[in-house]
């Protein structure tokens, strides 16, 4: 037995060296030392075969005695030759085993005592827990108590929730990796004396380890199986989920429902006990719902459901759902199977319904331009486009030709009459056949008037004539205003890629409409603004109203229609120098016209 202080600087130099040398002179001690030295010499020869045998037996024995006495560090506190440092391990003096030459802290082996008198054998020798386990029955219970105090078996997988602020945002926390924890419950058992005593890091580099210690090291250092790891992880997930639900019921659901007089505590129970009961039952039902029966494991949706239930049941606006849960009107097995939309508070559900409704209304299915064929007994037959007008079989070609000639003659006579009327001065504007009745509504200024629209033309050729359809019900509702300096360049630029329909807006003949019409023109013209109208159909991108005074035609109108539409100007009504008018510009997405 040897004793030394916990320092690497005095390794091999202790105050009992003289006593040991004196013991070696005795016969029993010589016999034991001789066996130890011989075994050390054999191991040294195997590790270094290139070293030549020494002739001086006494010198060899002297050197090996020092090395054997020095031994190696292996203590229950985890100290070993690789990590031992006197600055870190301040556990006091160390004692050396007379059986395997291992160094151990006296306090670690005696459960905090400074002496080892109780562990000495009859012949005043010290043996470690591997050489004589019967001397260390007291360590098993003490180490178990130490593990239970120092190690938190149930690490919070979801982490603690900050409940100081009821208005805080719900934070969804990720799972904590089990590798980040110090020790698992199974690994804590490895501290027991009869289990993992010799660590793997200590076993491979020791020169004087006994055969028994090597066997124990090999048998006890088996790696845990994947199944054990999964079951441990699953257990921690379930424990922390139940803990999270317990906090949810005790701090939010039960107090809020009691305060709103929607729930009363049963007789003989308090908030904590009833919350724990609810939390346990809720976790059990959630576990059953998320259990993969085929593989016997939890699905990944388990953690997502825990967070979803927690965040929605914590919501103060979800008071009705909380009351249904605690009163039992909503069974827990149905609660765990509800999706996020069903768990949301009424305001969120109403908002989602409105959003879905708008999405469905704006949903457009584009009709492909490619020809469609269908397989029949005659082969592939082309299906004509339904949107194209079909020929009326009641009319023959001759009747259609005669009908066209009559219509042409009537059109010529109408044009002559129109020119004759236009030459005559008239105080009112002429309403042609293409005029569309409309109502102008300006809520921002509180102005309303009735009038009509005359179609002027389009910047591009359209697939079909939609100038009437684009106006819809004729109600022109002003949504806002836009600076003319911004709108004019935009319309000019977009006219290259989009079709723009142009109309001229006139008021009705009644005096009230004319007065309101003049106020609208003056307001927009003086402030340099144009009015934005709510689009009437799904293929309309923008709808603008542009003012004009003094009989001038806006430059943007000339830029959009161009010189090739100069004939369209004949359809403008004659404007006096002080006359006011409005022009409507409708930007159309042709790909949505069917």
Swiss-Prot record:
Disordered: annotated span: 23-65, 142-231
Annotated PHD-type zinc fingers sit at: 72-134
Keywords, comma-separated and alphabetical: Metal-binding, Nucleus, Phosphoprotein, Repressor, Transcription, Transcription regulation, Zinc, Zinc-finger
Basic and acidic residues bias (residue ranges):
36-63, 155-164, 209-231
Q: Which GO terms describe its biological process?
A: DNA-templated transcription; negative regulation of transcription by RNA polymerase II; regulation of transcription by RNA polymerase II
The listed locations are:
Nucleus
- Locate the TFIIS central domain: which residues? 254-365
Cellular compartments per GO CC? nucleus
Q: Which InterPro entries match?
A: SPOC_C, TFIIS_cen_dom, TFIIS_cen_dom_sf, Zinc_finger_PHD-type_CS, Znf_FYVE_PHD, Znf_PHD, Znf_PHD-finger, Znf_RING/FYVE/PHD
Family classification: Belongs to the BYE1 family.
The record's note on its domains: The PHD domain is involved in the binding to H3K4me3.
**Protein name, as recorded:** Transcription factor BYE1
From which source organism is this entry? Saccharomyces cerevisiae (strain ATCC 204508 / S288c) (Baker's yeast)
């Amino acid at each position: 037995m040897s004793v030394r202080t916990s320092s690497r600087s005095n390794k091999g130099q202790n105050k009992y060296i003289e006593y040991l040398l004196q013991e070696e002179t005795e016969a029993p001690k010589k016999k034991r030392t001789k066996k130890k030295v011989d075994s050390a010499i054999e191991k040294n020869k195997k590790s270094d075969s290139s070293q030549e045998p020494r002739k001086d037996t006494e010198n060899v024995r002297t050197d090996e005695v020092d090395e054997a006495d020095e031994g190696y560090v292996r203590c229950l506190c985890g100290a070993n030759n690789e990590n031992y440092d006197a600055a870190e391990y301040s556990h006091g003096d160390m004692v050396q085993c007379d059986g395997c030459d291992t160094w151990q802290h006296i306090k670690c082996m005696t459960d905090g005592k400074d002496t080892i008198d109780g562990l000495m054998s009859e012949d005043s020798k010290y043996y470690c827990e591997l050489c004589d386990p019967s001397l260390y029955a007291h360590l098993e219970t003490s180490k178990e108590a130490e593990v239970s105090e120092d190690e938190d078996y149930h690490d919070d997988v979801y982490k603690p929730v900050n409940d100081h602020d009821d208005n805080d945002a719900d934070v969804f926390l990720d799972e904590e990796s089990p590798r980040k924890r110090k020790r698992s419950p199974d690994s804590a058992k490895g501290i027991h004396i009869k289990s993992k005593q010799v660590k793997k890091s200590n076993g491979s580099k020791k020169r004087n380890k006994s055969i028994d210690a090597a066997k124990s090291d090999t048998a006890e250092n088996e790696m845990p199986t994947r199944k054990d790891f999964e079951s441990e992880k699953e257990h921690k997930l379930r424990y922390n989920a139940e803990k999270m639900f317990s906090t949810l019921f005790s701090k939010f659901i039960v107090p809020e429902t009691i305060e709103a007089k929607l729930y009363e505590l049963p007789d003989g129970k308090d908030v904590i006990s009833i919350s724990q009961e609810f939390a346990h039952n809720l976790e059990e039902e959630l576990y059953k719902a998320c259990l993969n029966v085929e593989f016997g494991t939890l699905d990944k949706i388990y953690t997502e459901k825990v967070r979803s239930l927690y965040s929605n049941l914590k919501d103060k606006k979800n008071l009705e759902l909380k009351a249904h849960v605690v009163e039992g009107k909503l069974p827990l097995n149905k609660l765990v199977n509800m999706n996020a939309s069903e768990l949301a508070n009424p305001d969120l559900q109403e908002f989602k319904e409105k959003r879905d409704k708008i999405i469905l209304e704006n949903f457009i299915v584009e009709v492909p331009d490619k020809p469609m064929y269908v397989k029949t007994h005659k082969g592939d037959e082309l299906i004509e486009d339904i949107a194209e007008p079909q020929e009326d079989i009641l009319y023959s070609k001759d009747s259609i030709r005669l009908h066209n000639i009559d219509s042409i003659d009537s059109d010529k006579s109408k044009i002559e009459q129109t020119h004759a009327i236009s030459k005559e001065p008239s105080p009112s504007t002429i309403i042609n056949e293409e005029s569309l009745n409309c109502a102008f509504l300006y809520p921002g200024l509180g102005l309303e008037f009735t009038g009509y629209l005359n179609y002027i033309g389009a910047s591009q050729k359209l697939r079909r004539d939609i100038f009437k359809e684009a106006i819809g019900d004729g109600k022109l509702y002003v949504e806002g205003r836009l600076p003319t300096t911004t709108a004019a360049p935009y319309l000019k630029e977009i006219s290259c890629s989009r079709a723009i329909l142009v109309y001229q807006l006139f008021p009705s003949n009644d005096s009230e409409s004319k007065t309101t019409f003049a106020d609208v023109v003056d307001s927009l013209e003086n402030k340099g603004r144009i009015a934005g109208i709510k689009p009437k159909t799904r293929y309309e991108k923008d709808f603008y109203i542009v003012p004009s005074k003094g009989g001038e035609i806006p430059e943007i109108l000339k830029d959009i229609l161009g010189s090739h539409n100069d004939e369209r100007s004949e359809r403008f009504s004659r404007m006096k120098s002080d006359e006011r008018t409005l022009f409507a510009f409708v930007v159309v997405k042709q790909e949505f016209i069917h």
